Amino acid sequence: MTTYSSREEIDEQYRWDLSSIFESDEAFLAALEEAKKLPPRFASFQGKISASAAELLAYLKLDDEAGLILTKLANYAERKSDEDTRESRYQDYSSQVMTLWVSLSSASSWFTSELLSLSEQEMEGFYSQEPELELYRRCLDVIFSRREHVLSPAEEKLLAAAGDMANQPDNIFSLLNDADLTFPDAHDAEGAAHPVTHGSYIPLMMSADRTLRESAYESLYSSYRQFRNTFAATLGAQNKQLKFFAEARRYESALEAALSANEVPTQVYTNLIETVHNNMDAMYKYVALRKELLDVDELRFSDLYVPIVDDVELTFTYEEACDIILEALRPMGENYLALVRRSLSERWIDVYETPGKRSGAYSAGGYGMHPVILLNFQGKLDDVFTLIHEMGHSIHTYLSCANQPVCYSDYVIFVAEVASTCNEALLTRYLLDHAKNERERAYFLNHFLEQFRATLYRQTMFAEFELKVAELTAQGAGITADALCGIYKELNAQYFGDGIALDENIALEWARIPHFYYRFYVYQYATGFAAAIALSQRILDLGEQGREDYLGFLKGGSSKPPIDLLRGAGVNMLSPEPVEDALKLFDEMVDEMAEACRKLKAEKH
């Protein structure tokens, strides 16, 4: 893969076009100056929206206007900064936008309390007086549904002031984990040293050299063991602040407080855990297959990342990757494909790595601009999956914005991962159907099974750990390193079964997971994955009906609660069925993998 020393070396077609946001820095700065006039306009409505339907409507229209311009300002500043993170000008632009966002939040902090001073009867009167308010009924209903959890203005101000303090467990964890923690070198079978970092750990764990894998595994956890009590204190503090805010807002639990923000019933969370518990056999079968294929006497946690199909070197040019995703997405229909082609021809995508460019990949966008995708394309299979994944987010954003008014154009995280993972599921099916030989097919199966294990099983285990720690905190129990290690080790025993050797290192894994500071976030990876598998299967099985239902979901934005949007697409996340169906597919794929590997073994002999 060609390496580039600057963006100017890259052909324009591989660099994103941000002109749909702002034509130039000058246009951005002019819009920013104009937007700085917004906070006083918000503040001027205080005391008026509860007295007049016309004033409430004017406020909501102003809120739409502000959301539009702030989204464009933030996108331009952040996208330009990500082109070269060393460029201080765009860091300054981002900082100015964030400052403005904080000012706007402060200038409008009174809104919810004042709105909730209106009775249901008064609100209905407002709808009669100003028919245009009907557009905002769902937005307002969501706020009214949380009436019992909103406090007095003085209490709200106090909770807001505590917000920065509540973020400190995450901040301390990040500094300890990312800045202060170092790891001893790992050594391979020849005795050569290999540096261990957060970035190098997984590549080392994928090495065919078992000595190196075990050394890297021991290296990583030796450092976490040294600071286990500090990590326990940060996680304990995180759970205490969640408990404090949940109780202050009169929620029954920290879980309910977190999920209510996305209108997701706690039943979805507990249902996920229960359904996975009832379908562990497929995971145990996969663990046994991995042990057999690696030909080891004892499967260890240091053996989980090494590929079980070797000798497959797949590389792709960017053009080949684009051709593959267009073919894989053919079941989505011509309208969807036309948008994908537009994204490729109209420069929505920033393709190649350059010095200073932000690492990783993402899709970003919003009302009034086309979405954009950042890649660091290296030509590996994972890069093809990344492209189709981010394309799923971008088309979701485009369709939501094209079919909803500003106030409903965004969508919550609970449904976001569905759109991206559905695309990945279609790519997996396409690759399996077009594998050139049995070895390539086994390689694709291995890729899918690992993705499945890491997403549905692993994230559900994480979700269960979060819930158990929250329940301990609610009981007033001490959150000690020993208690956390005990819970985590027991969960690993349950999720992996007898087919793997439990050790004291894996009991410490909780200490290195940043998502445990994200407030009951990880379950959405698992539910999103299950929903995506179900929807991709519907699209393949039902053809046009499945496709139209799915496109309706993508166009829905936040016009309905996420559970209702998914139900409209044909998936009921309140039932165990989507998770059960996904786990059934995993079970079938494990059998396919075993059969493919048996054929490969027979070919060798």
Regions found by a protein language model. Give the residues of each.
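Long, K/E/R/D-enriched contiguous segments that form extended
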Residues: 293-331, 337, 371, 396, ...
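Short pre-active-site segment immediately N-terminal to the catalytic Zn-binding motif
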Residues: 314-316, 368-388
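A well-structured
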Residues: 1-311, 596, 601
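Catalytic zinc-binding patch centered on the HExxH motif and its immediate surroundings
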Residues: 314-316, 349-369
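C-terminal, non-catalytic "cap/extension" segments appended to globular domains
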Residues: 8-10, 23, 111, 115-118, ...
